[in-house]
A protein has these predicted regions:
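Secondary-structure transition/capping motifs at alpha-helix termini
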Residues: 1-2, 36-43, 64-68, 85, ...
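Structured secondary-structure scaffolds
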Residues: 2-48, 100-104, 148, 154-369, ...
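N-terminal catalytic cores of NTP/NDP-binding nucleotidyl/phosphoryl-transfer enzymes
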Residues: 2-75, 94-110, 114, 131, ...
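A glycine-rich helix N-cap at a beta->alpha junction
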Residues: 76-91
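Cys/His-rich short segments
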Residues: 115-168, 172
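Helix-rich, typically C-terminal accessory recognition domains appended to large enzymatic cores
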Residues: 120, 343-380, 391-499, 615
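Intrinsic disorder at enzyme termini
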Residues: 473-557
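Phosphate-backbone binding interfaces of nucleic-acid-interacting proteins
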Residues: 533-658
Length: 658
């Protein structure tokens, strides 16, 4: 019997830099769903990839001294490495620089133009370069980009526009008649009330202000913008062809069963993408799910805040499956989730090392100790066994129900409910006492069998979320019974075989103090490495500058000032000022907040990680409503350019300058 196809897609990652753990959450979430669908017997195709065109990339490549293609090759490679590190089972990793994709995008653009859905005009408004988006004055927030909060510029350019307005009513009708199309419900309401019902404006779909994009083949002054380029990857990745010569993959898997994207870009994927598909006379994805954000503490991750956490660092500290568990377990269905170092350590020690790891280790060790590792089931049952079996048999239906609604965290909780019940069963049956009674050996074997079978069933279900750990547990039990669809049966663990002689420690406990010392040491080492790798400026003999001398002071006056080395661990722009930055500066074992008028010369991102010279005994002052507890020293040239004064050699934060 042929398997039913299931196509799941994610947003494609923008190749502007290395993805943090918040970006990584989406691919792990999609992977858990794809793995689960395979376990249910579906023929799954899972696609992800990278979005590689745009002005931001053109600028970053120029700053790096490489071509845009060289730049995206490097970043796309980094992204793919992290996706692979996280053990994601994608079937297709598409790049928007792929030749087939680029050719099909040109054909899609031309088709839409030829049928009158794309027309040429002029776009004028407030433009945000990082977001590559135009905004009207009313859309700005405090005069800045409503999406990223950065400064915007006035811009006008010739552009092609896509007639969103032509299809608005049709899309509204579709959403109303397909209640599962946009999920969760809150995202659907947001799209309807904030965008569709007030009326859609036509969409700018080309650019002339940069060249790094797919050329419009009939007007090469223009490049195709992201709304046509990136959004079409979900069909071009299947071999869709505008001329009707689509690959069998497209015919088999389209429309997508699940399109998984972040809540911040849901407008593009529930309005722009569906209308493009309607204009191409193609079916829409069956469901678009806008997942919430994974935060660090109470806020989004940002380099300027110094709170960015990368997946590969977490893997180094905890291991792949532990990181998968953190991000999947801590994400609610429709609200933002949050991780902290303290929470990750708690989950590691309580859930993974104790509830799961210790249970597996104890059970296998007892079977080795009491029965030489041989698995047997004499069937000497008692009433206490019934509840364990009931919890085990109920698990798969509960997991199915949660996964059907994409409540992945809740599904994992159902598996851990069984693991907790197994731990309780040990306390109830006390195998170590049974072992001392020669007349209770068959009962002891039955108890251990029930435990191992409960563990086996939990491990089979965990394969979608912790694939390596699942396989290790099943291997240690020596079982080939790994079929999720058979979890409605208790007692499939084969008898007569043997468990592993020395069970592996699945998850080692972590000491929070030792971990944070390692994290801080790694941060310092990375900052030092980046500083050492920075290209040195060629030494030049320059003409000196003269300044107006100030009144002389005594040595005693000078000695009143205290200078120390400080390390900037976080930095952000002061909202009420265009000149000020607010830095969190580590000095010794304390952190001070210092406001500096250097915003025109350094971005917040550039400041983080720098060692600077600080006057530390100035009386605190308030600048633009923000308290400042010191002064960061800079030098100023004749043109007013500022440069931070930094130690020539590596010095610890807090070192006295004398």
């Amino acid at each position: 019997m042929a398997k039913k196809p299931y196509y799941i897609t994610t947003a494609i990652a923008y190749t502007s830099g290395k993805p943090h753990i918040g970006n990584t959450y989406e691919i792990v979430l999609a992977d858990s769903i794809a793995r689960f669908k395979r376990m249910q017997g579906y023929d799954v195709r899972f696609q992800t990839g990278t979005d590689e065109h745009g002005q931001k990339i053109e600028i970053k490549a120029g700053e790096a001294g490489v071509t845009p293609k060289q730049f995206v090759d490097n970043v796309s490679g980094q992204i793919k490495e992290i996706w692979d590190l996280m053990n994601t089972s994608y079937d297709k990793f598409i790049r928007t620089t792929d030749e087939y994709h680029e050719k099909q995008v040109q054909k899609i653009f031309k088709k839409l133009h030829d049928q009158g859905d794309i027309y040429k005009g002029y776009y004028e408004g407030k433009y945000c370069t990082p977001c590559e988006s135009f905004f009207t004055e009313s859309q700005l927030v405090d005069g800045k980009c409503p999406d990223c909060g950065r400064e915007v510029i006035d811009a006008k350019e010739e552009a092609y526009f896509f007639k969103l307005s032509k299809y608005a009513d049709r899309l509204i009708d579709y959403i109303n008649t397909h209640p599962e199309f946009i999920q969760p419900e809150s995202r659907k309401n947001e799209m309807m009330n904030n965008f569709l019902l007030p009326g859609l404006q036509d969409l700018c779909v080309s650019r002339t202000s940069f060249k790094w994009g797919i050329p419009v083949d009939f007007d090469d002054k223009h490049v195709v913008y992201v709304w046509i380029d990136a959004l079409s990857n979900y069909i071009t990745g299947l071999g869709y062809d505008v001329d009707g010569n689509s690959d069998e993959l497209y015919k088999k898997y389209w429309p997508a069963d699940l399109h998984l994207i972040g809540k911040d870009i849901i407008r593009f994927h529930t309005i722009y993408l569906p209308i493009m598909l309607m204009a191409l006379d193609l079916p829409l994805p069956k469901q678009v799910f806008g997942h919430p954000w994974l935060l660090v503490g109470d806020g989004k991750m940002s380099k300027s805040k110094g709170n960015v956490i990368y997946a590969d660092d977490l893997v180094n500290y905890f291991g792949v499956d532990a990181v998968r568990y953190f991000v999947l377990h801590e994400m609610p269905f429709d609200n933002d989730g949050s991780i902290t170092w303290e929470l990750m350590v708690e989950r590691m020690n309580s859930d993974l090392a104790n509830i799961l790891g210790n249970l597996v280790n104890r059970t296998i060790s007892m079977n080795n100790k009491y029965f030489g590792g041989v698995i047997s089931n004499p069937g000497v049952n008692e009433p206490v066994d019934d509840d364990l079996k009931a919890v085990a048999l109920a698990m798969h239906e509960k997991v199915d129900a949660k996964m059907e609604k994409l409540r992945v965290a809740d599904a994992i909780t159902e598996v851990f409910t069984l693991l907790r019940r197994c731990n309780k069963y040990i306390d109830e049956t006390e195998p170590w006492k049974l072992a001392k009674d020669e007349t209770k050996q068959d009962r002891l074997a039955t108890v251990l069998y029930n435990l191992m079978e409960g563990i086996r069933m939990a491990a089979v279900a965990l394969a979608a979320y912790l694939p390596d750990t699942s396989a290790k547990i099943l291997d240690m039990l020596g079982t080939q019974e790994r079929d999720y669809l058979k979890l409605d049966q208790f007692g499939l663990l084969e008898t007569g075989g043997k468990v592993v002689e020395k069970p592996e420690i699945l998850f080692a406990r972590v000491d929070i103090k030792e971990l944070m010392e390692k994290v801080e040491a790694d941060k310092a080492a990375n900052a030092q490495a980046q500083s050492a790798a920075a290209p040195a400026e060629e030494a030049e003999t320059e003409e000196g500058i003269d300044i107006e001398p100030k009144a002389e002071i005594t040595f005693d006056d000078f000695e009143k000032l205290q200078f120390q080395v400080g390390e900037i661990i976080a930095c952000e722009a002061v909202k009420k000022s265009k000149k000020l930055l607010c830095s969190q500066v580590k000095i010794g074992n304390q952190v001070r907040q210092i406001v500096s008028g250097i915003r025109k010369h350094y971005s917040p991102e550039e400041m983080v990680g720098k060692k600077v010279m600080v006057v530390t005994n100035l009386k605190p002052a308030t600048l633009a409503g923000v308290k400042s507890e010191g002064m960061i020293l800079c030098a100023e040239d004749a043109d007013g350019n500022l440069s931070l004064m930094v130690p020539e050699k590596k010095m610890p934060a807090g070192a006295e300058i004398c």
